Amino acid sequence: REVALNLYKGKCGLHHNEDRWAYISDLCGKVPSWKEDYLSILTHAQYKCMPAHGFFVLDAVFEALKKAKVSKEFLENHNVSLIVSNDSECYESADLVKHVKSDADNRQLPVTTLFNTLNSAISMNLASILHIHGLSLTVSAACAGGGHAIGLAKMLLDSKQTEMVIVIGAQECASRYCMEAFDALGVFSPDNVQPFGKGRNGLAPSGGAACIILEPSDSLRLKEEKVPSFASLSGYGFSSNGKAITTPDSYQEEVSMLKAIENAGLDEGMIDVVLAHATGTPMGDEAEAKAIESIFPICPNVVATKGMTGHECWMAGVSQAVQATIMFTYGRLFHAATTEENAFPKLNLVMRPKWYSPHHILCNAFGFGGTNSSFIISKV
Protein backbone atom coordinates (compact mmCIF):
# COMPACT_ATOMS: atom_id res chain seq x y z
CA ARG A 1 0.00 0.00 0.00
CA GLU A 2 2.84 2.39 0.84
CA VAL A 3 4.43 1.77 -2.57
CA ALA A 4 1.11 2.43 -4.31
CA LEU A 5 0.48 5.69 -2.45
CA ASN A 6 3.96 7.04 -3.13
CA LEU A 7 3.78 6.20 -6.84
CA TYR A 8 0.33 7.75 -7.19
CA LYS A 9 1.58 10.89 -5.44
CA GLY A 10 4.50 11.02 -7.87
CA LYS A 11 6.92 10.89 -4.95
CA CYS A 12 10.52 10.52 -6.08
CA GLY A 13 12.49 7.86 -4.23
CA LEU A 14 15.91 9.01 -5.44
CA HIS A 15 18.62 10.81 -3.48
CA HIS A 16 22.29 11.78 -3.68
CA ASN A 17 24.30 9.12 -1.84
CA GLU A 18 27.53 10.38 -0.26
CA ASP A 19 28.88 6.80 -0.14
CA ARG A 20 29.26 6.94 -3.91
CA TRP A 21 31.91 9.69 -3.75
CA ALA A 22 34.01 8.32 -6.63
CA TYR A 23 31.09 7.95 -9.03
CA ILE A 24 30.36 10.16 -12.03
CA SER A 25 26.84 10.47 -10.57
CA ASP A 26 25.83 9.86 -6.95
CA LEU A 27 22.08 9.85 -7.71
CA CYS A 28 20.42 6.56 -6.78
CA GLY A 29 17.42 4.99 -5.08
CA LYS A 30 16.96 5.55 -1.36
CA VAL A 31 16.16 2.09 -0.03
CA PRO A 32 15.11 1.69 3.63
CA SER A 33 16.45 -1.14 5.75
CA TRP A 34 14.70 -4.51 5.82
CA LYS A 35 11.82 -4.85 8.25
CA GLU A 36 12.51 -7.98 10.27
CA ASP A 37 15.21 -8.97 12.74
CA TYR A 38 16.41 -12.03 10.85
CA LEU A 39 18.99 -12.90 13.49
CA SER A 40 16.08 -14.10 15.61
CA ILE A 41 14.28 -15.86 12.74
CA LEU A 42 17.03 -17.70 10.86
CA THR A 43 19.62 -20.13 12.12
CA HIS A 44 23.15 -18.76 12.49
CA ALA A 45 24.28 -20.61 9.35
CA GLN A 46 21.30 -19.38 7.31
CA TYR A 47 21.95 -15.80 8.39
CA LYS A 48 25.65 -15.92 7.55
CA CYS A 49 25.10 -17.56 4.14
CA MET A 50 22.63 -14.89 3.00
CA PRO A 51 24.03 -11.91 1.03
CA ALA A 52 23.00 -8.48 2.30
CA HIS A 53 20.21 -7.84 -0.20
CA GLY A 54 18.86 -11.30 0.54
CA PHE A 55 17.17 -9.83 3.61
CA PHE A 56 15.14 -7.51 1.36
CA VAL A 57 14.19 -10.66 -0.54
CA LEU A 58 13.02 -12.33 2.67
CA ASP A 59 10.84 -9.30 3.46
CA ALA A 60 9.23 -9.48 0.01
CA VAL A 61 8.81 -13.27 0.01
CA PHE A 62 7.28 -13.52 3.47
CA GLU A 63 4.83 -10.71 2.66
CA ALA A 64 3.84 -12.37 -0.63
CA LEU A 65 3.39 -15.79 1.00
CA LYS A 66 1.21 -14.23 3.70
CA LYS A 67 -1.01 -12.43 1.18
CA ALA A 68 -1.35 -15.60 -0.90
CA LYS A 69 -2.09 -17.68 2.23
CA VAL A 70 0.72 -20.11 1.46
CA SER A 71 1.60 -22.07 4.59
CA LYS A 72 4.92 -23.57 5.62
CA GLU A 73 3.28 -27.00 5.42
CA PHE A 74 2.22 -26.41 1.81
CA LEU A 75 5.77 -25.47 0.80
CA GLU A 76 7.18 -28.55 2.50
CA ASN A 77 4.71 -31.01 0.98
CA HIS A 78 4.10 -29.75 -2.56
CA ASN A 79 5.98 -29.29 -5.83
CA VAL A 80 6.73 -25.58 -5.48
CA SER A 81 9.42 -23.93 -7.63
CA LEU A 82 11.57 -20.87 -7.09
CA ILE A 83 12.98 -18.60 -9.81
CA VAL A 84 15.13 -15.60 -8.91
CA SER A 85 16.38 -12.81 -11.16
CA ASN A 86 19.80 -11.75 -9.85
CA ASP A 87 23.00 -10.85 -11.66
CA SER A 88 25.58 -9.80 -9.07
CA GLU A 89 26.93 -10.14 -5.55
CA CYS A 90 29.45 -7.30 -5.74
CA TYR A 91 29.42 -6.25 -2.10
CA GLU A 92 30.19 -9.74 -0.80
CA SER A 93 32.80 -10.35 -3.52
CA ALA A 94 34.56 -7.06 -2.73
CA ASP A 95 34.51 -7.95 0.95
CA LEU A 96 36.04 -11.34 0.12
CA VAL A 97 38.92 -9.73 -1.80
CA LYS A 98 39.51 -7.23 1.01
CA HIS A 99 39.80 -9.99 3.62
CA VAL A 100 42.13 -12.13 1.51
CA LYS A 101 44.43 -9.16 0.84
CA SER A 102 44.41 -8.21 4.49
CA ASP A 103 45.05 -11.69 5.92
CA ALA A 104 47.13 -13.06 3.02
CA ASP A 105 45.52 -16.40 3.84
CA ASN A 106 42.22 -17.64 2.45
CA ARG A 107 42.03 -20.23 5.23
CA GLN A 108 40.80 -17.41 7.47
CA LEU A 109 37.64 -17.02 5.40
CA PRO A 110 34.37 -18.20 6.97
CA VAL A 111 32.94 -21.35 5.37
CA THR A 112 29.80 -19.36 4.55
CA THR A 113 31.71 -17.03 2.19
CA LEU A 114 31.20 -19.24 -0.86
CA PHE A 115 27.44 -19.28 -0.41
CA ASN A 116 26.93 -15.51 -0.38
CA THR A 117 29.24 -14.61 -3.27
CA LEU A 118 27.60 -16.65 -6.04
CA ASN A 119 24.99 -15.16 -8.36
CA SER A 120 22.74 -18.01 -7.24
CA ALA A 121 23.17 -17.12 -3.55
CA ILE A 122 19.56 -15.96 -3.19
CA SER A 123 17.93 -19.00 -4.79
CA MET A 124 20.15 -21.57 -3.04
CA ASN A 125 19.60 -19.99 0.37
CA LEU A 126 15.85 -19.55 -0.11
CA ALA A 127 15.41 -23.10 -1.37
CA SER A 128 16.83 -24.26 1.95
CA ILE A 129 14.92 -21.79 4.13
CA LEU A 130 11.54 -22.38 2.41
CA HIS A 131 12.00 -26.15 1.90
CA ILE A 132 11.57 -25.91 -1.88
CA HIS A 133 11.20 -29.26 -3.70
CA GLY A 134 10.59 -28.05 -7.27
CA LEU A 135 12.97 -26.18 -9.55
CA SER A 136 15.34 -23.75 -7.83
CA LEU A 137 16.99 -21.44 -10.33
CA THR A 138 18.68 -18.07 -10.71
CA VAL A 139 18.24 -16.18 -13.98
CA SER A 140 21.12 -13.84 -14.84
CA ALA A 141 20.03 -11.73 -17.78
CA ALA A 142 20.92 -8.20 -16.69
CA CYS A 143 17.94 -5.84 -16.60
CA ALA A 144 15.73 -8.23 -18.57
CA GLY A 145 16.16 -10.98 -15.96
CA GLY A 146 12.97 -10.24 -14.05
CA GLY A 147 10.86 -10.51 -17.20
CA HIS A 148 12.54 -13.75 -18.22
CA ALA A 149 12.07 -15.19 -14.71
CA ILE A 150 8.35 -14.49 -15.00
CA GLY A 151 8.25 -16.02 -18.49
CA LEU A 152 10.06 -19.17 -17.39
CA ALA A 153 7.61 -19.50 -14.51
CA LYS A 154 4.75 -19.34 -16.99
CA MET A 155 6.35 -22.07 -19.09
CA LEU A 156 6.74 -24.31 -16.03
CA LEU A 157 3.11 -23.87 -15.06
CA ASP A 158 1.79 -24.26 -18.62
CA SER A 159 3.67 -27.56 -18.92
CA LYS A 160 2.28 -28.68 -15.53
CA GLN A 161 5.74 -29.46 -14.19
CA THR A 162 5.11 -27.58 -10.95
CA GLU A 163 2.17 -26.50 -8.81
CA MET A 164 3.36 -23.02 -7.90
CA VAL A 165 6.25 -20.71 -8.71
CA ILE A 166 7.67 -18.08 -6.39
CA VAL A 167 9.26 -15.45 -8.66
CA ILE A 168 11.69 -12.97 -7.16
CA GLY A 169 13.61 -9.98 -8.45
CA ALA A 170 16.65 -9.11 -6.34
CA GLN A 171 18.96 -6.15 -6.77
CA GLU A 172 21.87 -5.08 -4.61
CA CYS A 173 21.18 -1.60 -3.30
CA ALA A 174 23.06 1.24 -4.91
CA SER A 175 25.97 1.10 -2.46
CA ARG A 176 29.66 1.84 -2.79
CA TYR A 177 30.53 -1.26 -4.81
CA CYS A 178 27.66 -2.65 -6.81
CA MET A 179 27.31 0.01 -9.53
CA GLU A 180 30.87 1.31 -10.05
CA ALA A 181 31.37 -0.38 -13.43
CA PHE A 182 27.86 0.56 -14.60
CA ASP A 183 28.43 4.21 -13.63
CA ALA A 184 31.70 4.20 -15.59
CA LEU A 185 29.67 3.88 -18.81
CA GLY A 186 28.48 7.46 -18.24
CA VAL A 187 24.78 6.61 -18.45
CA PHE A 188 23.71 7.74 -14.96
CA SER A 189 21.79 10.99 -14.59
CA PRO A 190 23.43 13.56 -12.30
CA ASP A 191 20.18 15.23 -11.28
CA ASN A 192 16.78 14.05 -12.58
CA VAL A 193 15.60 10.93 -14.41
CA GLN A 194 13.09 11.77 -17.16
CA PRO A 195 11.68 8.67 -18.90
CA PHE A 196 10.82 9.55 -22.53
CA GLY A 197 11.59 13.20 -21.71
CA LYS A 198 13.17 15.76 -24.02
CA GLY A 199 15.71 16.59 -21.35
CA ARG A 200 16.54 13.01 -20.37
CA ASN A 201 20.19 12.49 -19.56
CA GLY A 202 20.45 9.04 -18.02
CA LEU A 203 19.16 6.63 -15.42
CA ALA A 204 19.54 6.28 -11.65
CA PRO A 205 20.11 2.82 -10.16
CA SER A 206 18.03 1.51 -7.30
CA GLY A 207 17.50 -1.82 -5.59
CA GLY A 208 15.73 -4.02 -3.09
CA ALA A 209 13.46 -6.94 -3.89
CA ALA A 210 10.07 -7.82 -5.34
CA CYS A 211 8.14 -11.08 -5.26
CA ILE A 212 5.08 -12.51 -6.99
CA ILE A 213 3.50 -15.93 -6.60
CA LEU A 214 2.13 -17.71 -9.66
CA GLU A 215 -0.15 -20.73 -9.75
CA PRO A 216 -2.78 -22.11 -12.16
CA SER A 217 -6.17 -20.38 -12.06
CA ASP A 218 -7.83 -23.77 -11.49
CA SER A 219 -5.64 -24.52 -8.47
CA LEU A 220 -7.51 -26.44 -5.79
CA ARG A 221 -5.58 -24.53 -3.13
CA LEU A 222 -6.96 -21.20 -4.35
CA LYS A 223 -10.51 -22.47 -3.95
CA GLU A 224 -9.96 -24.17 -0.59
CA GLU A 225 -8.15 -21.19 0.95
CA LYS A 226 -10.44 -18.66 -0.79
CA VAL A 227 -7.43 -16.76 -2.07
CA PRO A 228 -8.31 -13.85 -4.38
CA SER A 229 -6.39 -13.74 -7.67
CA PHE A 230 -4.89 -10.28 -8.11
CA ALA A 231 -4.17 -10.65 -11.84
CA SER A 232 -3.34 -13.17 -14.54
CA LEU A 233 -0.05 -13.68 -16.37
CA SER A 234 -1.43 -14.15 -19.87
CA GLY A 235 1.57 -13.84 -22.20
CA TYR A 236 5.36 -13.84 -22.49
CA GLY A 237 7.69 -12.97 -25.34
CA PHE A 238 11.43 -12.58 -25.83
CA SER A 239 14.10 -11.76 -28.39
CA SER A 240 17.79 -10.92 -28.66
CA ASN A 241 19.38 -8.15 -30.68
CA GLY A 242 22.52 -9.98 -31.79
CA LYS A 243 24.41 -6.69 -32.04
CA ALA A 244 26.75 -4.64 -29.84
CA ILE A 245 26.36 -5.48 -26.17
CA THR A 246 25.04 -2.04 -25.14
CA THR A 247 23.09 -1.07 -28.27
CA PRO A 248 19.27 -1.28 -28.14
CA ASP A 249 17.37 -2.49 -31.21
CA SER A 250 13.84 -1.21 -31.67
CA TYR A 251 12.95 -3.96 -34.16
CA GLN A 252 13.88 -6.77 -31.75
CA GLU A 253 12.07 -4.99 -28.91
CA GLU A 254 9.05 -4.94 -31.20
CA VAL A 255 9.47 -8.68 -31.82
CA SER A 256 9.53 -9.34 -28.08
CA MET A 257 6.30 -7.40 -27.53
CA LEU A 258 4.52 -9.01 -30.47
CA LYS A 259 5.47 -12.50 -29.22
CA ALA A 260 3.95 -11.69 -25.83
CA ILE A 261 0.75 -10.43 -27.44
CA GLU A 262 0.50 -13.55 -29.61
CA ASN A 263 1.26 -15.84 -26.67
CA ALA A 264 -1.60 -14.22 -24.74
CA GLY A 265 -4.02 -14.82 -27.62
CA LEU A 266 -4.67 -11.11 -27.99
CA ASP A 267 -4.33 -8.59 -30.79
CA GLU A 268 -2.57 -5.25 -30.55
CA GLY A 269 -5.80 -3.29 -30.11
CA MET A 270 -6.57 -5.12 -26.86
CA ILE A 271 -3.50 -3.77 -25.05
CA ASP A 272 -4.63 -0.68 -23.17
CA VAL A 273 -1.48 0.05 -21.14
CA VAL A 274 2.23 -0.39 -21.82
CA LEU A 275 4.36 -0.35 -18.68
CA ALA A 276 7.59 0.69 -20.36
CA HIS A 277 11.20 -0.22 -19.60
CA ALA A 278 12.02 3.50 -20.07
CA THR A 279 15.05 4.08 -17.85
CA GLY A 280 15.66 7.66 -19.02
CA THR A 281 18.66 7.07 -21.31
CA PRO A 282 18.70 8.87 -24.69
CA MET A 283 19.23 5.77 -26.87
CA GLY A 284 17.23 3.27 -24.84
CA ASP A 285 14.07 5.35 -24.55
CA GLU A 286 14.18 6.32 -28.23
CA ALA A 287 14.41 2.67 -29.33
CA GLU A 288 11.51 1.62 -27.10
CA ALA A 289 9.35 4.56 -28.17
CA LYS A 290 9.96 3.67 -31.82
CA ALA A 291 9.02 0.02 -31.16
CA ILE A 292 5.80 0.96 -29.36
CA GLU A 293 4.81 3.42 -32.09
CA SER A 294 5.45 0.76 -34.76
CA ILE A 295 3.20 -1.83 -33.09
CA PHE A 296 0.27 0.39 -32.15
CA PRO A 297 -1.32 2.66 -34.79
CA ILE A 298 -3.38 4.09 -31.94
CA CYS A 299 -1.00 4.27 -29.01
CA PRO A 300 -2.30 2.88 -25.70
CA ASN A 301 -1.53 4.56 -22.39
CA VAL A 302 2.22 4.40 -21.75
CA VAL A 303 3.29 4.32 -18.10
CA ALA A 304 6.91 5.01 -17.10
CA THR A 305 7.77 4.92 -13.39
CA LYS A 306 11.58 4.82 -13.23
CA GLY A 307 11.85 8.56 -12.67
CA MET A 308 10.37 7.82 -9.24
CA THR A 309 11.66 4.33 -8.46
CA GLY A 310 15.00 4.48 -10.22
CA HIS A 311 16.09 1.59 -12.40
CA GLU A 312 15.95 -1.54 -10.25
CA CYS A 313 17.99 -3.51 -12.77
CA TRP A 314 17.86 -7.25 -11.96
CA MET A 315 14.54 -6.88 -10.09
CA ALA A 316 12.91 -4.45 -12.55
CA GLY A 317 10.68 -6.94 -14.40
CA VAL A 318 9.25 -8.43 -11.20
CA SER A 319 8.61 -5.01 -9.68
CA GLN A 320 6.76 -4.08 -12.90
CA ALA A 321 4.46 -7.07 -12.38
CA VAL A 322 3.74 -5.75 -8.88
CA GLN A 323 3.11 -2.25 -10.27
CA ALA A 324 0.73 -3.62 -12.92
CA THR A 325 -1.22 -5.49 -10.24
CA ILE A 326 -1.48 -2.30 -8.17
CA MET A 327 -2.93 -0.42 -11.15
CA PHE A 328 -5.54 -3.15 -11.61
CA THR A 329 -6.41 -3.02 -7.91
CA TYR A 330 -6.87 0.75 -7.71
CA GLY A 331 -8.13 1.45 -11.24
CA ARG A 332 -5.64 4.26 -11.62
CA LEU A 333 -2.48 4.67 -13.71
CA PHE A 334 0.89 5.84 -12.46
CA HIS A 335 2.32 8.88 -14.23
CA ALA A 336 5.77 10.02 -15.35
CA ALA A 337 6.00 12.57 -12.55
CA THR A 338 9.60 13.61 -13.22
CA THR A 339 9.34 13.96 -17.02
CA GLU A 340 9.05 17.64 -17.87
CA GLU A 341 8.19 17.31 -21.58
CA ASN A 342 7.37 14.24 -23.69
CA ALA A 343 9.98 13.87 -26.44
CA PHE A 344 7.75 11.59 -28.53
CA PRO A 345 4.42 13.22 -29.52
CA LYS A 346 3.01 9.95 -30.91
CA LEU A 347 3.63 8.23 -27.58
CA ASN A 348 0.60 8.49 -25.30
CA LEU A 349 2.72 8.98 -22.18
CA VAL A 350 0.71 9.35 -18.98
CA MET A 351 2.00 12.66 -17.60
CA ARG A 352 -0.65 13.34 -14.96
CA PRO A 353 -2.53 11.09 -12.50
CA LYS A 354 -5.20 9.25 -14.48
CA TRP A 355 -8.18 7.20 -13.37
CA TYR A 356 -8.37 4.28 -15.77
CA SER A 357 -9.25 0.62 -15.34
CA PRO A 358 -7.01 -1.41 -17.67
CA HIS A 359 -7.65 -4.95 -18.90
CA HIS A 360 -4.27 -5.91 -20.37
CA ILE A 361 -0.92 -4.36 -19.39
CA LEU A 362 2.12 -5.09 -21.56
CA CYS A 363 5.36 -4.87 -19.55
CA ASN A 364 8.87 -4.53 -20.99
CA ALA A 365 12.24 -5.36 -19.42
CA PHE A 366 15.30 -5.05 -21.66
CA GLY A 367 18.92 -5.77 -20.76
CA PHE A 368 22.57 -5.53 -21.75
CA GLY A 369 23.61 -8.07 -24.32
CA GLY A 370 20.47 -7.22 -26.26
CA THR A 371 18.23 -9.58 -24.30
CA ASN A 372 14.59 -8.48 -24.40
CA SER A 373 11.62 -9.69 -22.38
CA SER A 374 7.97 -8.72 -22.53
CA PHE A 375 5.01 -10.09 -20.62
CA ILE A 376 1.33 -9.32 -20.27
CA ILE A 377 -0.58 -9.00 -17.01
CA SER A 378 -4.35 -9.23 -17.45
CA LYS A 379 -7.26 -8.38 -15.21
CA VAL A 380 -9.19 -11.34 -13.75
Name every feature range the model reports, one short phrase each.
Residues 1-18, 26-27, 188-266, 272-273:
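Condensing-enzyme catalytic core mediating Claisen C-C bond formation in acyl metabolism
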Residues 1-46, 68, 220-234, 322-336, ...:
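ACP-dependent fatty acid/polyketide chain-elongation machinery
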Residues 7, 61, 82, 126, ...:
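Conserved small-residue
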Residues 9-137, 170-178, 268-286:
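Conserved beta-ketoacyl condensing-enzyme motif
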Residues 42-62, 109-118, 136-150, 197-210, ...:
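Active-site pocket-shaping loop/turn-to-helix segments
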Residues 67-85, 96-111, 128-136, 158-165, ...:
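Structural signature of cysteine-dependent C-C bond-forming condensing enzymes
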Residues 86-88, 142-145, 169-174, 235-240, ...:
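Acidic, glycine-rich active-site loops and adjacent beta-strand->loop/helix elements
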Residues 140-214:
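Internal metal/ion-chelating core segments
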